[in-house]
A protein has these predicted regions:
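Catalytic-core regions of glycoside hydrolase
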Residues: 177-345
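Extracellular/luminal regions of secreted and cell-surface proteins that mediate adhesion/ECM remodeling
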Residues: 373-538
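An active-site-proximal structural segment forming one wall of the substrate-binding cleft
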Residues: 112-133, 150-177, 198-210
């Protein structure tokens, strides 16, 4: 930065005025790092992050001979409904009524064939090639038509679980979650006399033991998940602050964070059509279940099908209700097709709540559907960026970023972060353009699964936002010498630096930040500032960091106001839902 001062004092007239303007628009020094005037607003675009959001269902019928794999997935986020009815003697596949006959065709209890498993693998490969993701459910209901009593004898369910596990284990990069169907109509664990809590728990635990921890496994209700985790008297013991819960949580360890639930009765009644109990002494009621999801489902997918309200029940299927409870349950995915009447109503209803940048006074025709669609799962916004001004002889680059997660939920799988250095200069007498572009991987300690969304707590009669989703991300990386990247001399030339966050898979699908993406298309990342390389500088170590003062100035704090909570951040203040006051 000294170079700007030298040039400033050597210039006169118009050139001096131009440089003063440039200097005023340039970043400001603070504690050895430079605060960049980057775009810090949510552009309110619907982002192409397909590991969350609205899914499209697609059925895959597996046969002993294999069947036809999914060649063209219908969406980037697919609900892959793989059904294995031909491997169950209890599943009737059709009725031949020709000539007055009524001959029923049944499946057959048998091992899953290699051909069938290959078709499942080919379908997952197609999803990967499409740069998509899938929520996977496997069941015995033919073509997902809602037939009852289709589940085979329990020993066959267990055999099929063990045979499916290797395929599922190989594809955790595209499987968002496994909805543990395997029982009942639609794979929803109802309408089947073969269903018991013990059988569902045994099958689910077998799947847990035979698949890696990256695969999140969901059951249909909180009661089933409680049984899987080892609770027997869940009406009494399934309270996250209770002694029995603490005992089981300690014994289960990380499995507590791997088991979740899917909800295909979502918001249809205050009980979600039986998902939550009405008698809290014998079942898990809504508040106990939500508190469990809030704590242990922090990185576990949650969603399903939102329904219209049943007659004479409380109406909770509104965007306004989701703008509160969605953050507690970390809701991350929903069916775009069901219930279509409810979704159509969301598209026609204006969203009249202010939630940070989602402000109906800023945006005309902000619908409830757009609010929900944009907030399912995670949504990262770069709010502040401080970076090293000069990379010296040691090649060290440092950054301090404030990234807010404004989505309902969090990342549910590991990703890789990296820095991208990009720049151009004119070289030679013909002003030929030279460019530089290279990527520097960041350590696994920079974990975006920990860039958490807001935290809302119930404290007596108060609803308090105790954390507003602003996360501090500290980066230290060795960018190395540019001599190893390009033959040109880049000393003193400002180079752009981007933060890039991508899935660790062959297609390198990257996360889109909610900031304006016009500039960020260069790198598939988010612009965090510029840096100058100068090897005459012996060290890039920042000058005396005044960390305490910076934190005091920038960190939000919670203040009570008339039985509510507001989060104050500098001169801004927000209501509990993030609306500006």
């Amino acid at each position: 930065m000294a170079r700007f001062h030298i040039r400033f004092f050597s210039l006169r007239g118009a050139a001096l005025a131009a440089l003063v303007l440039t200097f005023m628009q340039a970043p400001v020094f603070a504690a050895g790092l430079v605060k960049w005037n980057v775009d810090t607003t949510d552009a309110m675009a619907t982002l192409a992050n397909y590991d969350r959001g609205f899914y499209t269902p697609q059925v895959l019928h597996l046969k002993p001979s294999g069947g036809k794999p999914i060649g063209k997935p219908w969406a980037k986020l697919l609900h892959l409904r793989a059904e294995i009815s031909e491997f169950s003697s209890h599943a009737w596949l059709g009725i031949d009524t020709t000539g007055g006959k009524k001959d029923t065709t049944w499946g057959k209890n048998q091992d899953l064939t290699e051909d069938a498993l290959n078709v499942l693998q080919e379908s997952l490969d197609s999803i990967r090639a499409n740069r998509g993701f899938a929520v996977v459910r496997i069941c015995y209901d033919p073509w997902y038509n809602g037939r009852s009593n289709v589940t085979p004898d329990h020993e066959w369910v267990l055999k099929h679980v063990k045979q499916l596990a290797p395929v599922l284990s190989k594809n955790t990069d595209v499987i968002v979650a496994l909805e543990m169907g395997m029982h009942g109509a639609y794979g929803e664990m109802h309408s089947d006399t073969n269903i018991t809590y013990d059988r569902i728990a045994e099958a689910t635990n077998l799947m847990l033991r035979n698949t890696p921890p990256e695969l999140k496994i969901l059951t249909r209700t909180g009661n089933y998940s409680a049984k899987v985790l080892g609770f027997d008297n869940w009406g009494v013991d399934f309270h996250i602050d209770g002694e029995k819960f603490a005992e089981i949580a300690k014994a289960k360890g990380d499995t507590m964070y791997r088991v979740g639930m899917f909800n295909d009765g979502y918001l249809g009644t205050q009980y979600d059509y039986g998902t939550w109990g009405a008698d809290c002494k014998t079942s898990i009621c809504r508040e106990e279940g939500v508190a469990w999801l809030e704590k242990y489902g922090i990185n576990t997918p949650y969603g399903g099908e939102a329904l219209t309200t049943a007659e004479n029940y409380q109406v909770i299927n509104t965007p306004e209700f989701l703008s509160y409870e969605g953050f507690r349950t970390h809701t991350s995915y929903l069916n775009i097709q069901w219930n279509n009447n409810l979704i159509d109503s969301w598209k026609k209803t204006l969203f009249n709540i202010k939630d940070f940048d989602y402000d109906f006074e800023r945006v005309d025709s902000l619908t409830g559907f757009k609010y929900i669609n944009d907030h399912l799962g995670y949504r990262f916004v770069l709010r502040e960026s401080w970076v090293t001004d000069t990379v010296g002889f040691d090649g060290i680059f440092r950054a301090k970023l404030r990234i807010q997660n404004v989505g309902f939920g969090n990342l549910t799988h590991k990703v890789k972060a990296s820095l991208v250095v990009n720049g151009m200069q004119q070289v030679g007498m013909l002003d030929t353009l030279a460019s530089i572009y290279y990527e520097v991987p960041l350590p696994d300690s920079i974990d975006f699964m920990k860039v958490h969304s807001r935290k809302i707590e119930i404290k007596g009669a108060d609803t308090v936002m105790t954390f507003d989703g602003n996360n501090e991300v500290l980066i230290e990386a060795k960018l190395g010498s540019l001599k190893n990247q390009s033959p040109e001399d880049w000393t003193g030339i400002p180079l752009e630096v981007y933060l890039k966050v991508c899935n660790d898979d062959p297609v390198k699908e990257c996360i889109h930040f909610a900031n304006d993406e016009t500039r960020n298309r260069i790198s598939n990342g988010v612009f965090i500032g510029k840096v100058v390389f100068d090897e005459s500088v012996k060290s890039s170590i920042p000058r005396s960091l005044s960390t305490r003062d910076m934190q005091k100035q920038n960190a939000p704090f919670v203040q009570r106001v008339r039985h509510n909570a507001v989060v104050r951040d500098g001169e801004k203040s927000y209501r509990v839902n993030g609306a500006k006051q």
